[in-house]
């Protein structure tokens, strides 16, 4: 029989503290822990070691071992790499008898033996009955002097060098525990190596002395010496790559939504380029009187600039008054709208297409921002825009129904593109329009039929102001509301946006439905009418 003393409890407490695991997870078999005289079994089977391991010895955690294995079988596994001081199998004491958890701690007498065992077993050897290779790494209690803190990556190494050459090169800086050249499947050097020193200070000295110190044979750049990437560094780099990919997708989606004008895009880019030239800066001072325009008028401002340029070009060749030409051109926009009052939905669709063709023709002309001054000083802007406003209204009940989807797609592209590029080219007016719409944030005022949107999958951090700013580029927003859970005071991730016209709502749907923000894609659709749920 084995003698029971207080020593097992003492050893168990030490193990619990050093292993950082629940006390119930640590147990030792008394017959392997104690002899009848109470002395501790070091399980090394050797007489040339003292009672304690070397000061720099490492306690290793070993996972993926069979649950049926005992300390004796584990000892046979580890002893080929060096004398074993102690093996502790982690057991589940909630079971009777306690069952192995499939992992253990092993302490060798020397640090070298532990590292050799790790190099030979970790992610390499798979034990009988296991599906994954052994996992062997320093225990948490050893992290203060972890290998990753002393391991160097050596780049731009001559492919003619072997491990001995690297050891000779770095041995002046301290004791080298491991030196390994990275090789490909063909066994040839990849031109880089890993060197592990006994202490971090030695590794730091090697970096200071060797980094960029020489260019080795066959290398295009000086030698690179730095700390090897840790697992944390690798995970962080992977997350950064994922974030970069998401940002690239977001940028692609953003520009994809902003380029809905198709062939008209170059003309609007020309508008932006001309707006940034010093000769055009004076043009903005003459249009401050337009600051009171609503978003619908602002939406068509770029078209007016194009019309003015077209009129000026026509005047130089035909001696016609530029402003009268502009007025007649804009009249082409208003006349089809008047005709669209007919009862025929097909006629309304054709009139809308005619208006769109005129709009595109005007926008396609060479843009001259300096003409806006003359246009602002001579012609009533509100009157000239009234025809285009009527176009919005004329599409309210007729143009949005009865098979005019193709027309609406084209109108959506034209309106959304003009709005966004005009906003970029005329920041003063756009900022004033933004101030006029601030009261829309948080309100629940509804617009006309077909002008109210329901937005799903909003980021939880989005508020009323965020959703307002997101949907303002497509028209005059009269209300924007994100719904909040009254219990948690957190967003429910959906909201409503209402415009003063259906065209703006369709433009927002075309541009923002499916738009990705972070890990979410917005779902934007028309809000159901209250009458939809009524049977009569």
UniProtKB/Swiss-Prot annotation:
Residues 58-141, 150-230, 451-529 form the RRM domain. One of its GO terms (molecular function) is mRNA 3'-UTR binding. Disulfide bonds: none annotated. Belongs to the CELF/BRUNOL family. This is CUGBP Elav-like family member 2. InterPro entries: CELF1/2_RRM1 (IPR034196), CELF1/2_RRM2 (IPR034198), CELF1/2_RRM3 (IPR034199), Nucleotide-bd_a/b_plait_sf (IPR012677), RBD_domain_sf (IPR035979), RRM_dom (IPR000504). Signal peptide: none annotated. The keyword Glycoprotein does not apply. GO terms for biological process: mRNA splice site recognition; regulation of alternative mRNA splicing, via spliceosome. It is found in: Nucleus; Cytoplasm. The keyword RNA-binding applies. SUPFAM superfamilies: RNA-binding domain, RBD. GO terms for cellular component: cytoplasm; nucleus; ribonucleoprotein complex. RNA-binding protein implicated in the regulation of several post-transcriptional events. May be involved in pre-mRNA alternative splicing, mRNA translation repression and stability. PROSITE patterns: RRM (PS50102). Keywords: Cytoplasm, mRNA processing, Nucleus, Repeat, Repressor, RNA-binding. Changing residue 105 to L: Does not reduce RNA-binding. Strongly reduces RNA-binding. It comes from the Eukaryota.
